[in-house]
A protein has these predicted regions:
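Short glycine-rich, Thr/Ser-proximal phosphate-binding strand/loop in the N-terminal lobe
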Residues: 6, 15, 19-66, 225
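Short glycine-aspartate micro-motif
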Residues: 8-12, 89-91, 146, 200-204
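Short beta-strand-loop/turn "lid" adjacent to the catalytic site in phosphate-handling enzymes
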Residues: 75, 79-125, 144-146, 152-163
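Phosphate/pyrophosphate-binding loops at sites that engage ATP/ADP/AMP, CoA/4′-phosphopantetheine
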Residues: 77-88, 192-195, 307-318
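Glycine-rich phosphate-binding loop of actin/hexokinase-like ATP-binding domains
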Residues: 153-250
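Oxyanion-binding "anion nests"
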Residues: 242-245, 249-275
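Adenine-nucleotide phosphate-binding core of ATP-dependent small-molecule kinases
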Residues: 262, 266-273, 279-313
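Glycine-rich phosphate-binding loops at beta-strand->alpha-helix junctions
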Residues: 318-334
Length: 335
């Protein structure tokens, strides 16, 4: 937070494997104001497009086949063409910080190398984030750039929730529940008052989905685990499965480790059940398509189970919050 009278302009980047979201904020001691926000969708495809919104105005630009680096260049040009204030700091959402990175951290080469070592823990997310950080460092070599980690919020989770029932040496090596969507959970808490209600459950429901039980501002449990692939079913991710099923697929169905990872991360969840990971499409199809209706029912069922478990963990509930694209825009899931 800047000192009184000082103004920072922060560019916030959320880079995924297929999309780039960005927003420019004026930040003062009294709060922040969004100056512009944008999105580049369908990265790497012929249909890739960039959109920038400044107030009531919107600008679009085609960027067919754009890589993450090229998409960032388009986003930077769009911002510069609108004569917006130049960023004084860049913040990057980073999905996984492992055990080492528990607070926002200045981005430099050693940090990037340490994040590369974590790619096996978040193979869908970290390569894109690292590419984005490298591109932003190249574009603005003298600008402070900060990595903000989704895992930080859950770092003080009680050991009984963080630990898996596997040999102790694995826990000592970092095999534990890390939890994700922490930046979203922190933001939600900041909107609930100071101090926030004591017992809160947040359901962050988007293409990636998780829930968290929060007591007195502290994460006490969350559905995602060692990787962002655990927990409830998601757009293309399976969520939690019987480990015996994975052994069966490896031994009896001819899956390799890589093909099994692809199955669980990119071919499962809503997509595997109903042929689409887009909840909007599934809602439209549900009245006449049994698989679409089943996918919605299964996701809702798993969310209800998680909420019920967390009410028991917290000993009651003061506030239930839905956020994320599905959480905000799909009433049938909230019901």
């Amino acid at each position: 937070v800047p000192e009184a009278g000082r103004v920072n302009v922060a560019l916030c980047l959320n880079i995924g494997s297929s999309s780039l979201k960005f927003a420019l904020f004026r930040v003062t001691a009294s709060g922040e104001a969004c100056l512009a926000s944008g999105l580049v969708e369908q990265l790497g495809t012929p249909g890739a497009r960039a959109q920038l919104k400044v107030g009531a105005n919107s600008v679009e630009r085609a960027c067919a086949g754009a890589s993450i680096s090229a998409a960032l260049s388009v986003a930077f040009r769009l911002l510069e063409e609108q004569s917006l204030p130049r960023a004084t700091v860049v913040g990057h959402r980073v999905v996984h910080g492992g055990r080492e990175h528990l607070t926002p951290t200045a981005i430099d080469r050693p940090l990037l190398e340490s994040l590369r070592a974590l790619i096996p823990l978040a193979p869908l997310h970290l390569p894109a984030a690292i590419s984005g950080m490298e591109a932003a460092l190249e574009h603005w070599p003298g600008l402070p750039q900060i990595a903000c980690f989704d895992t930080s919020f859950h770092a003080r989770m009680p050991e009984c929730a963080a630990r898996f029932p596997v040999p102790a040496q694995l826990f000592d090596q970092g095999v534990r529940r890390y939890g994700f969507h922490g930046l979203s959970y922190e933001y939600v808490l900041s909107t609930l008052g100071d101090p926030p209600p004591r017992r809160v459950i947040v359901a962050h429901l988007g293409n990636g989905a998780s829930l968290a039980a929060i007591e007195a501002g502290r994460s006490v449990d969350t559905t995602m685990g060692f990787t962002p692939g655990g927990g409830i079913l998601m757009g293309t991710r399976s969520g939690d499965l019987d480990p015996g099923l994975l052994l069966y697929l490896l031994r009896e169905n001819g899956y390799s480790v890589d093909s099994l990872e692809h199955l669980l991360e990119r071919e499962s969840g809503l997509l595997g059940i109903a042929g689409s990971s887009d909840m909007r499409q599934l809602v439209e199809r549900a009245e006449h398509d049994e698989r679409a209706a089943l996918a919605i029912e299964m996701m809702g069922y798993q969310i209800r189970k998680a909420i019920g478990a967390y009410v028991a963990v917290l000993g009651g509930l003061d506030v239930l919050v839905f956020t994320g694209g599905i959480g905000e825009h799909t009433p049938s899931i909230r019901r």
